[in-house]
Amino acid sequence: ENCNKGLIHMDASSRDENAIAGLIYLTPNADLNSGTSIYKLKDNYKFKEEDGEHILKLKKELYLNDNIDTKEWDKMIKKNHNDFDETIKFNNVYNRMICYNTFEWHSAMSTNAGDDDRLTLIFFIRGIHAGMYPLTRVSSMPC
């Protein structure tokens, strides 16, 4: 049920204070619902370090094509998605590029792009030197 959902995560590390993540969808005629969602943590969410370690272990098993326990993965994805509210949804449209702050929580809406694999080009832009991002500038202006 949840096996085709992506894991909600962020790409940030301590060196990514002024970094942008982006991706370009490269599957022609993909299922629109195989795009990307941006999330915010629910107010009552309390992150536990062991949750993060468990997620990394399962993710490594998945990427290395080890025999992953699909019931365990399904349970973890369900819990992961229950901790967040979706705020933005980008449909998978061929050659569409999206960008977001590396501190934004995000996931693949579905890993099933239809007849073909969900193919994306992921990139990071680091070392942006500016006083403030446009959104920060606008947010700090008096009304």
Task: Enumerate the language-model features and the residues they cover.
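Catalytic core of non-heme Fe(II) oxygenases with the double-stranded beta-helix
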Residues: 2-143
